[in-house]
């Protein structure tokens, strides 16, 4: 760039000096004026000394700039930051308790954003407001529409693989299913009863029974009006963040990225219901979609004509009739995704129609027309109901429930407080939580316990005052009791079911020769011999199959315990008058099965569902009673109904876990009769439902069964061979041998176990382990899977770390002693663990709690001591699993000393037999150059070399011994007879040694034998050392002796086993390696380092010579030189080399002539 030169520099410099002086004078005058102002205002020395430069110069940066924190959750009160919101809350609670309300942060439920509650609320209204969502569609070339892509966030339980999209549901599942022992410490129930008793006519007083503060939290004394409200408080309140840490530790979050969802091309047709004109006395009411649909033949129609009856889920229980249609009748209760009390039920006639009973059926709605005798009572029922069936055109009353009468036309007059129920009400019973048939004990099928009640003959109205002063649940009227027409007093329960014609009474034995009292039957009905009231002394609880029943009414009494309910087919296939009794002997094909005999007929279907086998049981026969009109009972051939039992569950949890946890299906086909056992009351049923979710493996046949089916399977399949597991040696023994085994084998251990000491409970850290799955862990250091048997040996090999200090222990005794002496009384973890969410379960006294045991292992008594040790092991600070793994370590039982018998010892290599152990060991030393030993870490029998004491690992063969002897430095190198191995021994030995155990070679996969001297690609790629065969005169290294060795190794061995290197080849080396042949590895490494300084780029011949003379692998020598060259080149690039010349550089500057340095010998630096 061209610039005009400046002229008149002297003048410019003079003016510049003058201008500078003027500016100095102006500045000085300004400072003097400012000083006068400051003197007029004197705040005092206190403010002067307390003022810093940052106060008067805010525009300049004061102090060092704070480092940016990359973690999402940062504390504004200090420099703390974390990745987990819970850790930030714990930090605020611990260090900033006073300012915690200022720094309280909550996450957005729809996105990762988190901030203060006010900011999050504003953010939610701006970005996630529940406004009208405009569905965006994309149209492809064909004109088809696709919805936009959406991501679904799901949570999974690490304990049982239960998944849900709601975080609250997951926390509730984990608390109820896996941390149920913590519920009692939070849930509180007030037991104070209200003073006045509420009246039935006062609806307001009913609400006073359950006060709004009936439930409360034991931790923070918060009150709740219901269990759900209390559960919501416990799981969402900030006061219980410690509980959230425990629950969050077993919850895994997954983001499922779903692609474009294709729309359905054909819309499903809506289900239409045709309604009849309503009756004059019962106006129809519009209702939401029905939960039950019944189609049954009417009285005046043929069996092929069906009338559809719809029961709406409304509170009024109204029914709408549909016009009759011609169809076949069948009954199906099908599982659906509807809410509770919603399902569908239709009835047609087919052969054989299935009956499906699922967990979502709730039969608490009255249903018109015919009924099913095989039902499961579901839902809360406030009145006692019976197990019989009310006939058609029979009305029924209920006084314990307030309902609106007048919804259905009544065929008979009722009392003033009667509840009208349609003819042939579907039978109901006490609630058992779900309408599922489940097998709860061997040989029986649980249906649900229903308290029976009295029944009425067809066409008779229930009188209100039948049994004065007592309830009608017994079903028996005193002899001579007159039926009165009055209302039933409050507190009595009326029978809810009648007995259809041809149906046997499913409870209790009726002695013959008894007469039914007149208060139960109408005047035109008789009772044949063999039918008696229930109040006669009978203890069996089972109705005999040979006893027929009239179409009239039989009293049924409540069983004392859950009895056996029998379902039998119809007694006849003809038309019987209503007044004609059923004669004895009409049911001839019924047989009496003993308890448990039905499930002995387990027939495998050959199919599997997710690896679980399915079975088929014996058939069951169910009679569908068909009511008749005009005094005649038209009883057709009974349709045989196979019942499929589906797994039962409760609530949303079971509905969500059913798809992920399939259960074996038990199909019951038609049979003459079947026994059904009623389930116990509500508490026992809940326990049975919990047991149905557990799976057990049969120790005999190694099959997987649910816990309830497992009991049946053990009784049916293995009844003859009932085996018991010995808790000491973990072996199965028959029942008759188990007691003898315990007395003989473990007599000393049992006597000592009676004096059991208190177990030690410790917590430790194992950062090298990663918990993979049940009973299996992975060692990150060894990169291998560790089983339950090897777990403790592996832990002690790497060492267990103390949670309170950096100490590491390789024995359990040292860890126990260290915990007693150094950390006695310490209950809280260090900051490294607590900040990352690690927590240990402690009781009220501060002792460790072990809610379950993941591993049970055994250690020798000399390493463990006499006490059992419970270990809670954390998988390191940086582990993703925050739940400790609980391990129980038991001392190895002292087995009674066995009497030494004279057993022959067999050599595993040459199959020679010896009578004494000394002769056996001498043979191994002289013949095979090995001696027996025990593996140091695995504690398993092994062999070691007698020359170098190295322990053989892996597959122990004669070929491996021969190869080792060629490489062994301590073994003699001559060709004497003691080092020669006979080829016949190698060829004839078909045994392999794996960790000292003799295993026949036939158990391993057999390879095709190749011709001698042939080397295939598989042999060349094999990583293991192959067998080596030597001849008697193998000194020359013939081809026969080297036939099993790879070609490259043969060449290298031939070169190394020949005569030593020549003098010419040694001249090619920069240094002589002959004196380092027998030196240690470090000395050889130092020689190679010196050789590298002389020649950093050795030739291939030099590398081979160094490898053969130093007895080092050639690849090791080459890699050593390459590594050193890389280090030097990297150092040259990063560091500037400097040379010290040996004289003063200041004096060198005075030298005016050139410097010439001559060549000199390089010295070793």
From Swiss-Prot:
Residues 303-327, 1005-1068 are annotated as: Disordered. Residues 1090-1132 bind DNA. Expressed widely, with the highest level in the brain. SMART domains: HOX, ZnF_C2H2. One of its GO terms (cellular component) is nucleus. A zinc finger (C2H2-type) spans 73-96, 106-128, 155-178, 215-240, 696-718, 724-746, 777-798, 800-823, 905-935. Belongs to the krueppel C2H2-type zinc-finger protein family. May be involved in transcriptional regulation. May play a role in neuronal function; perhaps involved in protection of brain tissues from oxidative stress. May be involved in erythroid differentiation. May interact with SMARCA4/BRG1. This is Activity-dependent neuroprotector homeobox protein 2. It comes from Mus musculus. The gene is Adnp2.
């Amino acid at each position: 760039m061209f610039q005009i030169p400046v002229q008149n520099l002297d003048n410019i410099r003079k003016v510049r000096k003058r201008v500078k002086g003027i500016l100095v004078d102006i500045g000085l005058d300004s400072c003097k004026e400012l000083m006068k102002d400051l003197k007029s205002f004197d705040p005092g020395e206190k403010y002067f000394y307390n003022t810093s430069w940052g106060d008067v110069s805010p525009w300049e940066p004061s102090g060092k700039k704070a480092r940016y924190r990359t973690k999402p959750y940062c504390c504004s009160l200090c420099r703390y930051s974390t990745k987990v919101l819970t850790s930030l809350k714990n930090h605020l609670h611990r260090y900033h308790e006073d300012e915690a309300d200022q720094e309280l942060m909550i996450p957005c439920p729809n996105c990762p954003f988190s901030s203060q509650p006010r900011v999050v609320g504003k953010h939610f209204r701006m970005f996630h407001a529940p406004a009208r969502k405009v569905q965006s569609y994309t149209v492809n070339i064909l004109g088809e529409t696709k919805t936009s892509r959406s991501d679904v966030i799901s949570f999974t339980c690490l304990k049982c693989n239960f998944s849900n999209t709601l975080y609250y549901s997951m926390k509730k599942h984990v608390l109820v299913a896996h941390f149920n022992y913590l519920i009692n410490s939070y849930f509180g129930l007030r037991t104070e009863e209200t003073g006045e008793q509420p009246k039935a006519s006062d609806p307001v007083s009913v609400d006073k029974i359950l006060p709004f503060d009936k439930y409360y939290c034991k931790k923070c004394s918060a009150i709740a009006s219901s269990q759900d409200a209390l559960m919501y408080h416990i799981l969402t309140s900030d006061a219980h963040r410690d509980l959230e840490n425990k629950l969050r530790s077993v919850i895994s979050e997954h983001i499922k990225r779903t692609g474009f969802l294709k729309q359905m091309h054909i819309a499903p047709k809506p289900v239409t219901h045709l309604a009849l004109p309503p009756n004059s006395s019962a106006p129809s009411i519009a209702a939401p979609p029905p939960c039950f649909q019944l189609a049954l033949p009417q009285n005046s129609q043929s069996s092929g004509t069906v009338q559809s009856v719809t029961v709406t889920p409304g509170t009024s229980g109204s029914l709408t009739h549909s016009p009759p249609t011609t169809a076949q009748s069948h009954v199906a209760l099908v599982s659906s995704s509807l809410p509770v009390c919603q399902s569908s039920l239709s009835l047609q006639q087919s052969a054989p129609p299935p009956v499906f009973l699922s967990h979502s059926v709730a039969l608490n709605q009255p249903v018109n027309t015919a009924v099913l005798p095989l039902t499961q009572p579901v839902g809360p029922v406030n009145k006692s109901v019976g197990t019989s069936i009310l006939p058609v055109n029979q009305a029924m009353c209920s006084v314990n429930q307030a309902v609106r009468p007048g919804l259905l036309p009544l065929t008979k007059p009722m009392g003033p407080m009667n509840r009208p129920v349609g003819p042939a009400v579907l039978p109901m019973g006490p609630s058992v939580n779900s309408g599922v048939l489940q097998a709860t004990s061997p040989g029986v099928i649980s249906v649900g316990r229903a308290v029976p009640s009295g029944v009425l003959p067809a066409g008779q109205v229930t009188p209100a005052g039948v049994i004065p002063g007592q309830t009608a649940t017994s079903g028996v009227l005193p002899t001579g009791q007159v039926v009165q027409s009055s209302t039933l007093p409050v507190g009595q329960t009326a029978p809810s079911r009648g007995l259809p014609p041809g149906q046997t009474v499913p409870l209790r034995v009726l002695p013959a020769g008894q007469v039914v009292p007149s208060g139960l039957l109408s005047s035109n009905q008789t009772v044949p011999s063999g039918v008696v009231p229930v109040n006669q002394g009978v203890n069996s609880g089972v109705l005999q199959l040979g006893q027929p029943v009239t179409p009239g009414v039989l009293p049924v009494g409540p069983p004392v315990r859950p009895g056996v309910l029998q379902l039998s087919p119809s007694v006849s296939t003809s038309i019987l008058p209503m007044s004609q009794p059923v004669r004895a002997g009409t049911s001839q094909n019924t047989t009496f099965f003993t308890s448990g005999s039905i499930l002995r007929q387990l027939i495998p279907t050959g199919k599997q569902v997710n690896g679980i086998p399915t079975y088929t049981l014996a058939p069951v026969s169910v009679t569908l009673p068909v009511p008749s009109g005009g005094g005649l009972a038209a009883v057709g051939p009974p349709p045989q109904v196979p019942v499929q039992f589906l797994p039962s569950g409760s609530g949303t949890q079971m509905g969500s876990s059913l798809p992920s946890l399939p259960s074996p299906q038990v199909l019951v086909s038609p049979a003459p009769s079947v026994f059904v056992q009623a389930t116990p009351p509500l508490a026992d049923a809940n326990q049975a439902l919990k047991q149905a979710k557990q799976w057990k493996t049969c120790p005999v046949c190694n099959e997987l069964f649910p816990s309830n089916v497992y009991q049946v399977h053990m009784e049916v399949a293995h009844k003859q061979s009932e085996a018991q597991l010995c808790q000491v040696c973990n072996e199965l023994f028959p029942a008759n041998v188990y007691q003898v085994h315990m007395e003989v084998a473990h007599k000393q251990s049992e006597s000592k176990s009676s004096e059991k000491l208190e177990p030690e409970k410790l917590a430790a850290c194992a950062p090298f382990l990663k918990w993979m799955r049940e009973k299996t862990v992975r060692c990150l250091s060894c990169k291998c899977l560790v089983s339950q048997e090897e777990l403790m040996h592996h832990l002690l090999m790497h060492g267990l770390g103390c949670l309170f200090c950096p100490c590491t222990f390789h024995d359990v005794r040292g860890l126990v002693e260290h915990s007693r002496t150094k950390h006695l009384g310490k209950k809280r973890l260090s900051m490294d663990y607590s900040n990352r969410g690690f927590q240990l379960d402690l009781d009220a006294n501060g002792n460790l709690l072990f809610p379950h045991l993941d591993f049970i292992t055994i250690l020798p008594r000399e390493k463990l001591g006499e006490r059992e040790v419970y270990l809670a092991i954390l998988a390191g600070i940086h582990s993703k699993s925050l739940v400790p793994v609980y391990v129980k370590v038991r001392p190895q039982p002292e087995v009674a000393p066995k009497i030494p018998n004279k057993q022959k010892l067999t050599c595993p290599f040459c199959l020679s037999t010896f009578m004494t152990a000394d002769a056996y060991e001498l043979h191994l030393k002289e013949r095979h150059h090995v001696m027996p030993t025990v593996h140091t870490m695995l504690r398993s029998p092994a062999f070691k070399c007698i020359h170098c004491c190295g322990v053989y690992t892996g597959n122990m063969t004669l070929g491996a011994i021969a190869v080792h002897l060629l490489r062994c430095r301590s073994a003699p190198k001559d060709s004497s007879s003691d080092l020669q191995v006979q080829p016949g021994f190698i060829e004839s030995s078909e045994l392999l040694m794996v960790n000292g155990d003799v295993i026949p070679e036939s158990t391993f996969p057999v390879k095709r034998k190749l011709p001698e001297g042939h080397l295939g690609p598989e042999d060349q790629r094999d990583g293991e050392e192959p067998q080596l065969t030597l001849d008697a005169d193998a000194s020359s290294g013939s081809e026969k002796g080297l036939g099993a060795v790879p070609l490259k190794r043969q060449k290298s061995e031939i070169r190394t086993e020949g005569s030593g290197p020549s003098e010419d080849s040694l001249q090619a080396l920069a240094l002589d390696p002959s004196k380092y042949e027998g030196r240690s590895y470090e000395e050889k490494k130092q020689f190679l380092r010196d050789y590298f300084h002389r020649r950093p780029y050795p030739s291939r011949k030099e590398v081979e010579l160094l490898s053969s003379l130093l007895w080092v692998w050639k690849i090791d020598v080459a890699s050593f030189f390459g590594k050193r060259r890389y280090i030097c080149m990297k150092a040259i690039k990063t560091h500037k080399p400097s040379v010290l010349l040996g004289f003063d550089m200041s004096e060198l500057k005075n030298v005016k002539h050139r410097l010439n340095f001559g060549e000199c010998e390089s010295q070793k630096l």
